[in-house]
Amino acid sequence: MNPYNVTGPSNSQVAQVESIVSQRLKGSFLWMVVGLLTTIGVGVAALANPSWLRFAYQNFNIILLVELGVVFLFSARAYTANVMTLKGMFFLYSALNGLTLTLISLRYNVFEVVIPALIGTLAFFIGFAIVGATTKRNLSSLTPYVMAALLGMIIVSFVMIGARYFNWAVLSGFSDTVSLVLGYVGVVVFSIFTAIDVNRIKNNVTQVALLEDETILDRIEIIGALSLYLDFINLFLSLLRIFGNKR
C-alpha cells in the first residue's frame, strides 16, 4: 500500500523512454560517423589535389585556429543557435579537420602507424562507448578528474612547444619521452571521456524524452555527436603519438 498515493512511471512510459534514448543515441553515433566520413572525404580529396595540401600546409596554423573558433562558437551557442546552424558548424569543423589530419597523418607510415592507430582507436572507442551506454551509474562525477588531466596535457604541450621554439636544450632532449607519455595519458583521458559523453547523451535524452519536443532532442543529438567526434579524433591522435614514437 502506498500511503502517499505516488506512482512511478508506467511500463509503457518506461518502454517509450528507452526507445527514444536508443533512437537518439544511435542518432548521435550516426552524425559522428557522417562527420568522420566528411573528414575522410576531404582528406582523400586533398591527397588527390596537391594544391589543397599545399594550401593546408601553408595555412596550417590558421586552419587550426579556425577549427578552435568553430568548436568554441558551437559550445557557446549550443543551446541558443538553431539546430541547422549547429549541424553546419559540425560539418565545417569536420571538413577543416580533414585537411589538418591529412597533413599530420602524412608524417607517419600508413601500415606501421596510421592503420594500427585507427584499429586501436576503434577498439578503445567502441569498448568505452559500450560502458557509457550500459552502466547504470551517472559518470558525470568523473568529469572534473579527466578535465584536470586534459588541462595538464595542454599545459605540458605548450611548454614543449615553447622549448622547441626557444631552443631550450634541457627540455628539448625529453621531447620524445614527453610525447609518448602524453600519448598514453591521452588514450586514458579520451577513452574515459567517450564513456562519459555516451552516458551524458543517454541521461540528457532520458530527462526530456517524455516532453516530446523534437527540437530539444535534435539539439542533444548533434551536441553529443560533436563530443563523440572529438573523443574519437583525439583518441586517434594519441595513438598516433604512441605508435609513431615507437617507430
Task: Describe each region flagged by the PLM.
Residues 1-247:
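A hydrophobic alpha-helical transmembrane-helix feature that marks the membrane cores
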